[in-house]
Amino acid sequence: MGAVTVRGLRRAFGSHVVLDQLDLTIAESEFVALVGRSGGGKTTLLRTLAGLDPVAEGSVEVPALRSVVFQEPRLLPWRRVWQNVALGLPRSRGRDEATKALAEVGLADHARAWPLTLSGGEAQRVALARALVREPELLLLDEPFGALDALTRIHMHALVRQLHERHRPAVLLVTHDVDEALELADRVIVLRDGRLDEQIETRELFDDRRDPRFEQARARLLGLLGVTDTHVADPTATPSSAATAP
């Protein structure tokens, strides 16, 4: 059985149907990226899987242990960094586990810092530590790198890959960034007109973006999203800008 099983999910806001009889399965430890146009229902789906939005129609099966990382880190400014990570953990082991989680994301020396002293990338690493300290079976990422600069995004991508390999949760990443989706995910899905329109099994296609099939998959995804791409990639270069859906 998969970590996530969704059948016939429908969600509408007034007369606007956002999710239309949507079906989705995510296997245990699988990393799935979801791309689509703005307002197309990506975040609505993620919030439903997180239990933040109700299931009005259809069925949703998800693990009890799940965590969410949003674009904004949402740290409590009046609590120290380690206390933000330890929120909800038993007091007897909260500090030790928070410290270990911070070490995993390279912030062991920031445990007693205040959130307002952190850079954007550091704050998002704290949010990742907070999400993973509970060892979730499902990790939901809602455009977690969208507010970061290009260099910080590259570092965060590497960190997320390492953490996924170490902890092995199932992951759903919502993103507008096609390159990001292709580089991180085992499978990239396009959400269009409220349904999962098409998917690309990236793990079977290439190991890194220097493979020519990366550009082929990239062009295909951008075409599905209605984006005209004039970019010609240097396969030896690390991207400094993102190809994003409108």
From Swiss-Prot:
The record's annotation in PROSITE patterns points to: ABC_TRANSPORTER_1 (PS00211), ABC_TRANSPORTER_2 (PS50893), SSUB (PS51291)
SUPFAM superfamilies, alphabetized = P-loop containing nucleoside triphosphate hydrolases
Ranges for domain ABC transporter: 4-218
The way this protein sits in the membrane is described as:
Peripheral membrane protein
- Per the record, the coiled-coil ranges are none
Q: Which residues bind ATP?
A: 36-43
Report the InterPro entries cross-referenced here. AAA+_ATPase, ABC_transporter-like_ATP-bd, ABC_transporter-like_CS, ABC_transporter_ATP-bind, P-loop_NTPase
From the UniProt record, which GO molecular function terms apply? ATP binding; ATP hydrolysis activity
Q: Where in the cell is it found?
A: Cell membrane
A GO cellular component annotation in the UniProt record: plasma membrane
Q: Is Nucleotide-binding included in the keywords of this UniProt record? A: yes
Q: What is its EC number?
A: 7.6.2.14
* One Pfam family per UniProt: ABC_tran
Q: Provide the alphabetized UniProt keywords.
A: ATP-binding, Cell membrane, Membrane, Nucleotide-binding, Translocase, Transport
Q: Which reaction does it catalyse?
A: ATP + H2O + aliphatic sulfonate-[sulfonate-binding protein]Side 1 = ADP + phosphate + aliphatic sulfonateSide 2 + [sulfonate-binding protein]Side 1
Note the subunit structure.
The complex is composed of two ATP-binding proteins (SsuB), two transmembrane proteins (SsuC) and a solute-binding protein (SsuA).
Describe its function: Part of the ABC transporter complex SsuABC involved in aliphatic sulfonates import. Responsible for energy coupling to the transport system.
What family classification does the UniProt entry report for this protein?
Answer: Belongs to the ABC transporter superfamily. Aliphatic sulfonates importer (TC 3.A.1.17.2) family.
The protein in question is named Aliphatic sulfonates import ATP-binding protein SsuB 2
| Annotated source species | Frankia alni (strain DSM 45986 / CECT 9034 / ACN14a)
What taxonomic ancestry is recorded?
Bacteria, Bacillati, Actinomycetota, Actinomycetes, Frankiales
